[in-house]
Amino acid sequence: MSKSKILVGDVVKVIAGSHKGELGPITWISKDKKWVSVQGINSLKHVKPSQTDSEGGIKEVPSKINLSNVALQDPKNKDGISKVGYQIEDGKKVRIAKKSNSPLKKASK
């Protein structure tokens, strides 16, 4: 699989599924880069008890979303973007949205 341009902390827009149109920051990316977890979106409410966590009940546990169902949020025109480019500014490599040519905020963990 090709390298993903989405990083932990980036604000993404859900583009498919029951949460379509919702925004949130990424909290986790799987090692094989196929799944992401977005804060406040697609969370499980009912949790069954397991051997490690003997107490089940109603808890908010983040669930995963396929990477193909999210797009980076463009800071300038508030659309989901599909292409990320890079520019050198002051000797540093900066990520930009190719459509609006605006810099993407640095992802904070």
From Swiss-Prot:
GO terms for biological process: translation. Keywords: Ribonucleoprotein, Ribosomal protein, RNA-binding, rRNA-binding. CDD domains: KOW_RPL26. InterPro entries: KOW, Rib_uL2_dom2, Ribosomal_uL24, Ribosomal_uL24_CS, Ribosomal_uL24_KOW, Translation_prot_SH3-like_sf. SMART domains: KOW (SM00739). The keyword Ribonucleoprotein applies. One of its GO terms (molecular function) is rRNA binding. GO terms for cellular component: ribonucleoprotein complex; ribosome. PROSITE patterns: RIBOSOMAL_L24. Pfam families: KOW (PF00467), ribosomal_L24 (PF17136). The keyword Ribosomal protein applies. Part of the 50S ribosomal subunit. One of two assembly initiator proteins, it binds directly to the 5'-end of the 23S rRNA, where it nucleates assembly of the 50S subunit. One of the proteins that surrounds the polypeptide exit tunnel on the outside of the subunit. Belongs to the universal ribosomal protein uL24 family. This is Large ribosomal subunit protein uL24. It comes from Mesoplasma florum (strain ATCC 33453 / NBRC 100688 / NCTC 11704 / L1) (Acholeplasma florum). The gene is rplX.
